[in-house]
């Protein structure tokens, strides 16, 4: 299963969240799931990627080209999609995922989460958008 994770890219996050999201990533990797995420190396995005990779899972990043500067993107992705815009990034995340998980984050995380919840409401299961969504 390809699981899209939305979460903080900031390093200004409580260490307990980092620990918890790394554990979530390890659990995903152990179960053979693939992490699909915004490609960030820091914050909860990076924690999820490190945890998933440490447990042998695959990691796919998606980010606009303008984020491709030293230290911003997770360097150990199995595959990386570069986009021209944030909207294209969100579309790839939506199209490629079987399920979505939102962990603590900021405005970007809320934007991504609310779009998924809106799609679920507008297209109930069987109506074109049947992926699952969860908050952690």
Regions found by a protein language model. Give the residues of each.
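Conserved phosphate- and dinucleotide-binding cores of soluble alpha/beta proteins
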Residues: 83-95, 99-136
């Amino acid at each position: 299963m390809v699981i899209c994770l939305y979460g903080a890219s900031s390093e200004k996050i409580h260490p307990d969240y980092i620990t918890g999201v790394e554990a979530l990533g390890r659990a995903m990797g152990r179960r053979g799931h693939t992490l699909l995420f915004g490609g960030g190396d820091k914050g909860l995005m990076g924690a999820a990627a490190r945890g998933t990779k440490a447990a042998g899972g695959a990691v796919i990043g998606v980010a606009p080209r303008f984020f491709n500067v030293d230290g911003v993107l997770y360097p150990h992705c199995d595959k990386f999609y570069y986009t021209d815009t944030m909207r294209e990034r969100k579309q790839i995340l939506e199209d490629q995922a079987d399920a979505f998980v939102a962990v603590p984050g900021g405005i970007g995380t809320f934007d991504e989460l609310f779009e998924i919840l809106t799609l679920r409401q507008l297209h109930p299961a069987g109506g074109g958008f049947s992926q699952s969504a969860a908050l952690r």
